[in-house]
Amino acid sequence: MKQDIGVCKSVSITCISETSWLDGDAWLKNVERAGGRNVDQWSVDWDEGNSGGYSSLIETEGLDGSSRKFLLDSGWNNAYMDAAFEREGIDAMLARREIEFLYVTHEHFDHYFGIASVLRHGPDITIMIPNTFHEKGHMLLKGARFPSSHAGNAFPHTGELVRHDPDIVYLLYPGCASVTFDLDVPFGV
């Protein structure tokens, strides 16, 4: 079924970090030691020295010349993501409220455990998540710590939390839409 989502004049994507882990072989050994891909990511003793994270800044220009920005995912290792956000000016954009929302694609460690790096600069930012988020994912957003996996957030989210049901097209704004899918993925999420 086709759905008209409107149009925008341009889209720009800035890759802040696409390095989920620094050494693939070391990451695979970490996964094997933990018991394989079906373990609960929240209980794995992840090698912090090998963690990076995924995050991108999406900027669109509307037909009227207006500009909008959102952040796609928050990365993994907070120290790594703090440096990446500072390098790209994301920290300042968050502090100035120039980034409209954070869109979390899924709660895997390399896309979500870096949530504190976003919230330290904008705890009230609107966050969009799949409606399939697990309880521990919500707990991290509220400020929980999971010492065994080195995941923690000292900056509880105070803004709006928008949940998207799977398989529904959500118009975010003209020319930009979202669809999430409920898939069987590894690491217990």
Give names to the regions the model predicted.
Residues M1-S67, A177-S178, D182-P186:
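Zn-dependent metallo-beta-lactamase
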Residues C8, G65, G122, P156, ...:
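Short, well-ordered coil/turn elements that cap or connect secondary structure elements
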Residues S17-T19, S74-W76, E107, T132-F133, ...:
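Active-site metal-binding loops of divalent metal-dependent hydrolases
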Residues L28-N30, E86-R87, S117-L119, L141-A144:
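Short, glycine/charged-enriched secondary-structure capping and boundary segments
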Residues A79-E135:
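Active-site metal-binding motif and surrounding structural segment of the metallo-beta-lactamase
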